[in-house]
Amino acid sequence: MLKEYTQPVTKPIDGDKNVFSVVVERAERKPDEPLVSYKDGTGSWRSFTAAEFRDKVIALAKGLIARGVMPGDAVSIISSTSWQWAALDMAIMSIGSLTVPVYETNSPAQVATIFNDSQVTMAFAENDAQRDKIESVRSRCSTLKDVYVIDFGALNTLEEYGRGVSDEEFWERERLVKGDDLATIVYTSGSTGMPKGIELSHGNFVYVTYAGTQSMPDIAYGRDRRLLLFLPLAHAFARYMVLYCFAGDVELGLSNNLKTILSDFGEFKPSFILAVPRIFEKVYTAASQKAGAGMKGRIFAKAAATAREWSHAQQEGNGFSASLRMRHAMYDRLIYRTIMGVFGGHCEYAVSGGAPLDGAIAHFFNGVGLPLLEGYGMTETCAPAMVNPTKGYRIGTVGLPLQGVSVGLGEDGELCIKSRAVCVGYHNHPEITQSQIVDGWLHTGDLGDIDDDGFVTITGRKKDLIITAGGKNVSPGILEASVMTSPVVDQCVVIGDRKPFIAAIVSLDLDETNAWLAAQGVEQVSDLAEAVRNPIVYAEVERAVNAANDLVSRAESIRKFEIVPEPFTEENGLLTASMKARRQAVIDHFGELIDTRIYAPKGR
């Protein structure tokens, strides 16, 4: 490694425990305090105490034993985020079986591929629609025996099956599960190709859980610690956060409806939140649009500029001038407190991950009073590998390695990670395992840098690196993240490999575009095709592109862009399940437009 940094461990972490031990320890430590909260069918919040949740998991695990689920058997869950998902996951893993998560948005063909690759024997579907998806490919899944529907009382049925299983039989099964045993196979297709199953062990999860709580103790421990989780539990990061809450003092709130997320924030009042950058961009955009284009809009613009100025002064350690203090106090009363109220009024920190965080957005929220702590991780690292600390965080970096994690840079600048949390390997793909994990170092595929204090900066994606016809190396991520902060832009894909200049394909968000047009006091559009033709919308995209170009050199800047009237979706193959653009698929899909409109030969 050209450069290497290891974060020391303040307290030894026992990676030989199983995942269920985290639940047991919390139930012993704080048995009567709320652990998992959720909305019932009437919209009221209900809670399981730690002891109640532990007992629920045991009851479900007994049902699985009664139905013949054996150690090493794969059991799948296809459901939105819910307490049932979390409890089933724990029950499956507690008896040495493997949880195989499937996104609700996965196609029947993808379900069949995942079920066959992992040899799923039992599946839990949230509702009729998910059950029908499974049934449509059941004849192609030779190992699948049972399918249960959660909405039809599957968990009650499972508990009934388990009444004849003794406590001793459950604990005998649980004691056999060790840190080296597999806990789950998580399928991720990334932004390129077919799904790959990533094998994560109990030790992976336990190690990264306590590495996280020891790295960020002021978020994990203390009074009134609450997290409202609304990411899909099929995502490894969401499952990690469940364990992080259990290992600390955190009450976990679960929400599965983004349409009610703002009211959920207000009711649950989280002390911290976890979200992808797009959520924070949308909150900023909504606040800007609500202010409008008149006097209120000008006041908001000045308040936003003051927040960023405050954040820069804080980060640079230069102190705050009297003028800045006065303006900040004024805008705090007028605007900042309202924005903080969006997150429930008690939120102290927000953790951002999953995609690059635009610096302007990070500085805005930091100046408002909500530090956005950017982190970095992969499914292969059992979610987080590094995160900014609550004290001394540095905007523009993805923070420090978690305790016990080593980071290094390869000769080509590729970021590599070594820790007890690095995955066992790629299921049924030993050749990928051997090429991606070398001497314990996971090769992430991302380009980065490590400063003398151990803070890591991501500079691009190795496989996404664009080399123009003139030989200029361009990392598209910074340009794409900046363009996507525009209220009208949904996705941006920068192109230009082996081409004479850099260009971009931009898609629009129709609802956000109309909200923005209304805030400007102009007529809304009926569809994306009309939006593409709208000169006001075009001017806004052009402004966003110009702002992105200010961040890079002339040779790296976007010279041309095309706004397309087609949304990027999973259905048309242009988005992954985690809402990231599939770069090559976008290039192939819009190949004719790219060849004839962007890079048309001279004379045509």
Spans of features found by a protein language model:
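Conserved pre-ATP/AMP-binding loop-to-beta segment of ANL
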Residues: 31-34, 149, 163-187, 194, ...
